[in-house]
Regions:
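C-terminal motif of bacterial Sec signal peptides marking the signal peptidase cleavage site
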Residues: 14-17
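Extracytosolic ligand-binding ectodomains
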Residues: 2-7, 19-433
Length: 433
C-alpha cells in the first residue's frame, strides 16, 4: 500500500504570498503538482482553474496546523491519512490511487486559508476537507465553489450554511447548531424540567439557536417562560440573573460563549448557581466554562451538550490514527473527517468521474436510502454490484438532507462535578435522528 502525500509547506505559501503568479510549487513526496497561482481576492477567484476532473481523485485538507485551533490538527491529519490508506488498500478510486494534499488553514487572524486554498485548487484537489472554524470556511467557500471544487467540512455547525448559495458543492459531516437545539430540549425534558428561562446572545447564532430550542421544547410540552437576549459584549448580568431568580422557571438555559461564565457566577451569587438550580449550556460554552470561573465549584452541576462521537468506543480507529499522528488522545472531529473522505470517494466511484459537480450530485445519496455498509471496501463492493448504498460512518448514520448535512448525529451530554473540566464518568452519548 502506498499513500502519496503532498505537503503544502509554509515556505511555499510564503512564496506564493509574495510573488503572485510566480509562486513556487508545494513540496511533494511524488510528482510535483502544477505551479500555483495565488490571489488576494476574498470572495471569488475567477483566475483559478476550473476543475473538470482528470481521472485521479485528489483530496486536499484545510486543517489548522497553526493558529488557535492547532491542537485539533494531529487527529484531523491522522484520520485523513487513514481514510486515504483504507481507500487505496481497497483498490483506490476509478482504478487509481487517491492523492492527498495537506494544507494549513491557520485561523481567522491570518490569510493562511486563502493562500492554501489557492494551492489546493491549482494542485488539482477535487474535494477540500475543511475548514474546522466556521469563520475560516466563510472566507474561502466562494473561492472553492467557483472553481468547481467540493468543500466538505467535518466541523462547521453554522446554520447559515444550510441555505448558502453553494452550487451544490458544500457539504458537512458536522450537524447544524439547530439539530443541537433539539437534543438540548430532549435532555432537559428527560430530566423532568418543564419551564425554562432562556438567555442568549443577541447575534445571528444566539437567536437562531434560541428559536430552535424554543420550538423543540414547546413541542415536547415544555414552556419557555422568559427569553432574555443580551449583546455579545455584556459583562454585567445582574439584571438578567434577577429576572431568572424571579421568573419561577425550574431551569435556566444559556446560549453564549465565554461570557456565560460571568452569568453563572452572578447566578451563583444569588443562590441559584448550577449546584442548587439546574443550568444548561451548549457547545459554545459548556466545554470551557469550568476554566473561566473564579472557582470550579461554581459550575458544579452545570450540564451541556455538544456534537461529539464517543471515540472511547472506536478503539481500533483511534489506535490507527495514533499510528499516523501524535494526538495525545485528542480526537475531536477525527471520525467526521474520516467519513467525509470516505463519502466523497464512494460518490466519485458511483459518478464514474472525479469531475466535482458530478461527484457532488451523488454525495447525499451515499448516506441514505440504500443497503447499509460501514467500510469503504464493503460499500464499494455493493456499489459495483449495482446496489444503492447507505454509508453508516464512524460519526453516525448521517442521512444527509438535500442541503448536504446530517439529519442524524451523535451528541455528548457533559456534566460538571466540581472540577474545572466536565466529569468523563458522567458523559452520555445520544444519537439524534
Amino acid at each position: 500500500m502506498k499513500r502519496l502525500v503532498i505537503f503544502l509547506t509554509a515556505a511555499a505559501l510564503a512564496a506564493s504570498a509574495c510573488s503572485g503568479s510566480d509562486a513556487a510549487p508545494p513540496t511533494t513526496t511524488g510528482t510535483a503538482p502544477p505551479e500555483a497561482t495565488t490571489t488576494s481576492v476574498f470572495r471569488t477567484a475567477p483566475q483559478l482553474p476550473l476543475n473538470e476532473g482528470d481521472g485521479t481523485f485528489a483530496v486536499g485538507t484545510l486543517f489548522p496546523l497553526t493558529g488557535e485551533d492547532s491542537a485539533l490538527a494531529p487527529a484531523l491529519t491522522g484520520s485523513a491519512q487513514l481514510a486515504i490508506d483504507d481507500i487505496n488498500e481497497a483498490g483506490g478510486v476509478l482504478g487509481q490511487e487517491v492523492l492527498l494534499f495537506e494544507g494549513d488553514s491557520g485561523d481567522n487572524a491570518t490569510d493562511t486559508a486563502n493562500q492554501t486554498v489557492d494551492q489546493l485548487i491549482t494542485s488539482g484537489s477535487d474535494v477540500i476537507v475543511g475548514a474546522v472554524a466556521t469563520d475560516v470556511s466563510q472566507r474561502v467557500i466562494d473561492k472553492i465553489i467557483t472553481s468547481n471544487v467540493i468543500q466538505f467540512s467535518p466541523a462547521n455547525s453554522w446554520p447559515g450554511f444550510t441555505d448558502y448559495d453553494d452550487n451544490g458543492l458544500y457539504f458537512r459531516t458536522a450537524p447544524s447548531d439547530l439539530l443541537q437545539a433539539g437534543v438540548l430540549a430532549d435532555v432537559i425534558n428527560r430530566d423532568g424540567r418543564r419551564t425554562v428561562a432562556l438567555t442568549y446572545q443577541s447575534t445571528e447564532y444566539g437567536e437562531a439557536l434560541a428559536d430552535a430550542f424554543t420550538q423543540s421544547f414547546t413541542e415536547l410540552g415544555g414552556e419557555v417562560t422568559e427569553r432574555l437576549p443580551y449583546p455579545p459584549d455584556t459583562t454585567d448580568f445582574t439584571a438578567i440573573a434577577d429576572v431568572i431568580l424571579r421568573s419561577g422557571a425550574d431551569t435556566a438555559v444559556t446560549i453564549g460563549f465565554d461570557e456565560t461564565a460571568a452569568l453563572v457566577e452572578t447566578l451563583d451569587g444569588l443562590g441559584i448557581g448550577p449546584s442548587t438550580y439546574p443550568v444548561y449550556g451548549v457547545d459554545a460554552n459548556t466545554p470551557t466554562i469550568g476554566t473561566l470561573v473564579s472557582d470550579p465549584a461554581v459550575v458544579d452541576g452545570f450540564v451541556g451538550v455538544e456534537p461529539a462521537v464517543g471515540t472511547a468506543f472506536l478503539f481500533d480507529f483511534t489506535q490507527q490514527v495514533d499510528d499516523r499522528a501524535e494526538t495525545d488522545g485528542f480526537y475531536v472531529y477525527a471520525p467526521e473527517t474520516y467519513d467525509a473522505i470516505i463519502i466523497s470517494a464512494l460518490a466519485t466511484e458511483i459518478a464514474g468521474t472525479d469531475e466535482p459537480s458530478a461527484v457532488a450530485a451523488q454525495i447525499n445519496d451515499v448516506t441514505r436510502g440504500g443497503v447499509q455498509c460501514s467500510t469503504f471496501a464493503d460499500c464499494l463492493e455493493l456499489a459495483i454490484s449495482g446496489e444503492d448504498i447507505d454509508y453508516e460512518g464512524l460519526g453516525g448514520p448521517y442521512e444527509f438532507t438535500d442541503a448536504g448535512e446530517p439529519t442524524a448525529a451523535s451528541f455528548r451530554v457533559l456534566t460538571y462535578s466540581g472540577a474545572a473540566t466536565p466529569d468523563p464518568a458522567l458523559d452520555e452519548y445520544v444519537l439524534s435522528r
